[in-house]
Structures are given as C-alpha cells and as structure tokens.
C-alpha cells in the first residue's frame, strides 16, 4: 500500500536525520483525510 511505503520512507529519514520529513507528513495527512487509516493507529508500530 502507498501508506506503508510513505511510513517506511518517514522511518528511514527519521533514522538518518533524527527528524521526520515534512513533505511526507503532509502527504500522509492527505491520505488520512481521504479515508486511509492513520498509521499511528496500527498496532505493529
């Protein structure tokens, strides 16, 4: 799923820089607004 790929990118960038990517956060917010589950509600995080 596209959401999973975005989450993976955020995790990789967070590990590299200690910071989450603002662009990915915006894209993720847009997906959540379209009805995708928010990734922070997923139990496997």
Curated annotation (Swiss-Prot):
The keyword Methyltransferase does not apply. Ion channel activity is inhibited by hexamethylene amiloride in vitro. Keywords: AIDS, Apoptosis, Host membrane, Host-virus interaction, Ion channel, Ion transport, Membrane, Phosphoprotein, Transmembrane, Transport. Residues 1-45 are annotated as: Disordered. The modification Phosphoserine is found at residues 17, 21. Its main location: host cell. Enhances virion budding, by targeting human CD4 and Tetherin/BST2 to proteasome degradation. Degradation of CD4 prevents any unwanted premature interactions between viral Env and its receptor human CD4 in the endoplasmic reticulum. Degradation of antiretroviral protein Tetherin/BST2 is important for virion budding, as BST2 tethers new viral particles to the host cell membrane. Mechanistically, Vpu bridges either CD4 or BST2 to BTRC, a substrate recognition subunit of the Skp1/Cullin/F-box protein E3 ubiquitin ligase, induces their ubiquitination and subsequent proteasomal degradation. HIV-1 lineages are divided in three main groups, M (for Major), O (for Outlier), and N (for New, or Non-M, Non-O). The vast majority of strains found worldwide belong to the group M. Group O seems to be endemic to and largely confined to Cameroon and neighboring countries in West Central Africa, where these viruses represent a small minority of HIV-1 strains. The group N is represented by a limited number of isolates from Cameroonian persons. The group M is further subdivided in 9 clades or subtypes (A to D, F to H, J and K). This is Protein Vpu. The gene is vpu.
């Amino acid at each position: 799923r596209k959401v999973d790929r975005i989450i993976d990118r955020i995790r990789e960038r967070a590990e590299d820089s200690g910071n989450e990517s603002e662009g990915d956060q915006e894209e993720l917010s847009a997906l959540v607004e379209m009805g995708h589950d928010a990734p922070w509600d997923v139990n496997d995080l």
